[in-house]
Amino acid sequence: MSRSTPSRSTPSRPVLRFAPSPTGLIHVGNARTALINALLARRAGGTFILRFDDTDAARSRAEYADAIATDLAWLGIPPDLTFRQSDRIGEYEAATQQLKASGRLYPAYESEDELELKRRLQRARSLPPVYDRAALALTAADRARLEAEGRRPHWRFRLDHRVVAWDDGVRGPQQVDTASLSDPVLVRADGSFLYTLPSVVDDLAMGVTDVVRGEDHVTNTAVQIEIFEALGGVAPRFAHHNLLTLPSGEGLSKRLGHLSLSALREAGQEALAVAAAAVLVGTSHAVEAVESLEALAGMVDLAHISRAPARFDPDDLAQLTARTLHMMPFEAAASRLAAAGIGGGVAFWLAVRGNLARFSEAADWWALVSQPAAGVVAESDRTFLGEAAALLPPEPWDGQTYANWIKAVKAASGQSGKALFHPLRLALTGLEKGPELAALLPLMGRERVAGRLGGGVA
């Protein structure tokens, strides 16, 4: 029997969530899921929830939860609501009792070794390794005997053995015959919960309208839809995006520490560059720098996500970070400049941003224009530079000052091209390349410029 998932009425304000397990640092692949959810919610005026799936007490750590919250704030997508599953055990226990009462949750007593033996025998007979539901045949006396032997049951959800269908936001029409699946264990023998049941309970309680996650959860979806319905709820819309892989085809994992968001942040990668790469790779859009998260949100479209793996090359991030800085408006940089003690306002930022590979380099350019420094003055250029210094106009200086000054220096010295510009740049900055001198001169001021042209520290 086939039955499509009942659909919710389209809400005016969608609710989406990102649900990491705090068992390690999140990487750029996790960021892809978080960003797609957050930006879809933001664009529609909806709610973005951060849910920590921390029911595995042995592996979950508070410091990882804190790091994840820090990473989302760095990306510019702080959640509207945050909660931990470990604070909601009572709700999961209530759902467990409801499923037991309706006959959908049943106790099973096999050990892992016994289950593995069953699977090996099934494979030897060319049968799929699906749980045989032997526990359903146990009598009350059988269960009492097993428990007297010290066995404690784990609890399985009895699937309907039907075809579950849904319209996936990325993959289109999907269907899974749950007869091909083992009845999933929802509660371990020690009473702790696996991922599946708490996720459904929370999505119902929080009014989640859309679940957008990696394609490795496609099969889970059919199981979860049955649990939604068994609890008397309506399943949200589902969308399963492609996963990021390295150019080699290797999948991303938490063990690749250099791709964690904290490592990328410490390496000086721009959050907006990381966001653009995470969201746009593996879509119909080119991976390019964007001016803002709002601009990136406008490019998020589930229909534009490819079904093929998304190849992510970490080496491309450096160039994307540079391009992001080159187009970053002053308003986006202002607070960071102030925090670093960098002045000069919009004039300074527009002068130097095109020469930045990392934001931290702005401090070097600020030191160059605001603090004493010695330029590079060749002995053969001293006369020329002295003439140039003598032709410096009085202040105040503006954007036209440099052009007028160069015109006068060229006329007086007869120099042109590299012979004109190169000695001036070396004397003023000590560097072969850099921002336009026309923009730097007003920031440096007449006294500093004259001093460096004279070969001094100014």
UniProtKB/Swiss-Prot annotation:
This is Glutamate--tRNA ligase 2. InterPro entries: aa-tRNA-synth_I_cd-bd (IPR045462), aa-tRNA-synth_I_codon-bd_sub2 (IPR020751), aa-tRNA-synth_I_CS (IPR001412), aa_tRNA-synth_I_cd-bd_sf (IPR008925), Glu-tRNA-ligase_bac/mito (IPR004527), Glu/Gln-tRNA-synth (IPR000924), Glu/Gln-tRNA-synth_Ib_cat-dom (IPR020058), GluQ/Sye (IPR049940). It is an enzyme of class 6 (ligase). The keyword Protein biosynthesis applies. A motif ('KMSKS' region) lies at residues 251-255. A motif ('HIGH' region) lies at residues 20-30. SUPFAM superfamilies: An anticodon-binding domain of class I aminoacyl-tRNA synthetases, Nucleotidylyl transferase. Catalyzes the attachment of glutamate to tRNA(Glu) in a two-step reaction: glutamate is first activated by ATP to form Glu-AMP and then transferred to the acceptor end of tRNA(Glu). One of its GO terms (molecular function) is ATP binding.
